[in-house]
Regions:
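Catalytic-core helical/loop segments in enzymes performing group transfer/polymerization on anionic/lipid-linked
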Residues: 1-417
Length: 417
C-alpha cells in the first residue's frame, strides 16, 4: 500500500507493533512463483526498505563458505545414516512403529531424512538462520507462522546457539487437523529438558483459539498458550451482521488445494456430476501455488463449453456470494461455515482426509464418497435459504477461533506481561 509493506495474513499484529512502538525487521523466505526469483525478491525488498521498512530475504545470507560447510556436514550425515541403517537390527526400526512388512517404507523415510533432500534442506536452513541471528543484533522476539515444518526447527535450533536471549513465538495461524501428524508427536518427544537432544520448539507455541488449544494440549506442549486469530479477525464482522444474499442465482464454489492430485480428483468429480452448469453457477477457486488452468487442460475439460467460471477474487468475496462450497483439505471449510454456506467435503480413497470440520464439534456438513452422492447433495442444498444456517453456525466459529479485534492476549505477549 503506497509503497509500504503490509503483511496480508498479519496486518492486525503489524499495526499493534506499530502502536506499541516495537520496531519490525521482516525476514522473507522465497517461494518461486509467477516468474519471481531471488533477484526480483531482493530488488522488491530494497525498494520497500527505501520507504522505511526493514526487509531481508533469506537468500541474501547464502555464501560459498556456507554451501561448502553444508556439503561437508551432509556427507558426514550420509555416512552416519547409511552406516547406522546397515548395522542396525531392522526389527528395532519396526518393532514399536509398524510391522516387519513395512520395512521398505521405513527405509525410504530413513534415507529421505538422513541422506535425501530433507537432510540437505535442514542443514542449509540451520546454517542460514545462524547467519541471520549473527547479522541482526539484539533481537527481542522472533515471531513466525508455525506449521511444524522442518525449517522452523532449524530456526529454533540456530537461535539457541547464536541468540539464546531471543524469544521465539511460533503462531499457529490457521487450523490443526488431527491427521496432520507433524503436530502430534509423542509427549516424551516434545518434553523440554534443557538438553541438546530436545526437539527445537519455539519458546511460546501460540494457538489461535480454544479448539486448537485443546487439541494441541493433548500432546502436553509445555509452552502452549493462546492468542487472537489475526488471519480470521475479519469474520467477526461477518458474524455480527445480518446475511444478505449478494446473488440471485445459486452458486457452487469449488475450492482447490495445494495438492495437485487431490485438486484433480475434486475437479473430475464436479465434471462427472455436472458436465455443464445449467441451473446454477459453478465457480472454481484455485490455490495460489496450484493454478487450475493446467489441471483443466490435463483433464481435457473445456471451461467455456461446461459454462464454468474461474474466479480469482478474495475468498471472503466469493463465500459471500456462494450458496454451497465443495472443499477438501482447507481452512476455507471453516470460513464457509461463518458465511452460512452449505459445506460439502469429499472423501477420496487415495487421499488423507485433512478437513478441519471433521475434527471439530460441528456436524452440519456433508461427507460424500461418490459422484452420485455429490450430485444428490448439491441438488438438495443449492437452492436452500442460508439465513437459518448462518445463525446456527455463529457460535461454533467463535468457539473455534478467538476473534477479539482488540487483541488483548497479543498485547500482553508482545509486551511480555
Amino acid at each position: 500500500q503506497q509503497g509500504k509493506f503490509r503483511n496480508k495474513y498479519g496486518t492486525p499484529i503489524q499495526d499493534k507493533l506499530y502502536e506499541l512502538n516495537i520496531p519490525i525487521t521482516w525476514l522473507m523466505i522465497l517461494v518461486p512463483y509467477n516468474g519471481h526469483n531471488l533477484e526480483s525478491a531482493i530488488k522488491l525488498a530494497k525498494r520497500l526498505s527505501d520507504n522505511g521498512e526493514k526487509i531481508l530475504v533469506m537468500g541474501e545470507f547464502v555464501s560459498i563458505r556456507l554451501l561448502l560447510k553444508g556439503t561437508l556436514w551432509w556427507l558426514f550425515q550420509v555416512a552416519k545414516g547409511v552406516g547406522f541403517y546397515y548395522f542396525t537390527d531392522k526389527k528395532i526400526l519396526t518393532r514399536h512403529l509398524t510391522s516387519q512388512e513395512c520395512l521398505p517404507y521405513v527405509k525410504y523415510l530413513w534415507q529421505h531424512s538422513f541422506v535425501g533432500l530433507s537432510c540437505v534442506a535442514g542443514i542449509i536452513d540451520y546454517l542460514l538462520y545462524r547467519n541471520v541471528f549473527k547479522s541482526i543484533p539484539k533481537i527481542g522476539d522472533c515471531l513466525y507462522y508455525c506449521e511444524m515444518q522442518a525449517w522452523e526447527k532449524a530456526l529454533n535450533a540456530a537461535k539457541k546457539i547464536e541468540s539464546p536471549a531471543t524469544r521465539t513465538l511460533g503462531f499457529q495461524h490457521t487450523v490443526v487437523e488431527r491427521n496432520h501428524y507433524k503436530y502430534f508427536y509423542h509427549r516424551d518427544d516434545v518434553r523440554q529438558c534443557n538438553k541438546p537432544t530436545d526437539m527445537p520448539l519455539p519458546d511460546l507455541l501460540i494457538s489461535n483459539g480454544r479448539f486448537t488449544h485443546s487439541l494441541l494440549n493433548e500432546i502436553q506442549y509445555s509452552n502452549l498458550c493462546q492468542a487472537e486469530a489475526v488471519r480470521q479477525l475479519y469474520l467477526s464482522n461477518i458474524l455480527d451482521k445480518e446475511y444478505v444474499k449478494s446473488s440471485s442465482r445459486p452458486i457452487l464454489l469449488v475450492v482447490g488445494v495445494l495438492g495437485q492430485h487431490e485438486t484433480m480428483s475434486l475437479i473430475s468429480m464436479v465434471y462427472r456430476a455436472f458436465p455443464v452448469a445449467n441451473q446454477f453457477d459453478i465457480w472454481f477457486k484455485g490455490y495460489p501455488c496450484t493454478p487450475l488452468e493446467s489441471i483443466f487442460a490435463d483433464l481435457g475439460i473445456d471451461v467455456n463449453e461446461s459454462n464454468y467460471k474461474m474466479v480469482h477474487s478474495d475468498i471472503a468475496v466469493l463465500l459471500e456470494a456462494a450458496s454451497a462450497v465443495f472443499v477438501p483439505s482447507s481452512t476455507v471449510a471453516l470460513e464457509a461455515v461463518a458465511f452460512g454456506c452449505s459445506v460439502i467435503i469429499p472423501l477420496f480413497p487415495d487421499t488423507m482426509l485433512m478437513n478441519p470440520l471433521v475434527d471439530a464439534a460441528y456436524h452440519d456438513y456433508s461427507l460424500i464418497t461418490s459422484t452420485d452422492d455429490f450430485k444428490a447433495r448439491v441438488e438438495d442444498v443449492i437452492f436452500k435459504n442460508r439465513d437459518a444456517v448462518c445463525e446456527k453456525s455463529k457460535e461454533f466459529v467463535k468457539n473455534y477461533w478467538n476473534l477479539d479485534k482488540t487483541l488483548p492476549l497479543w498485547t500482553r505477549k508482545l509486551l511480555k506481561n
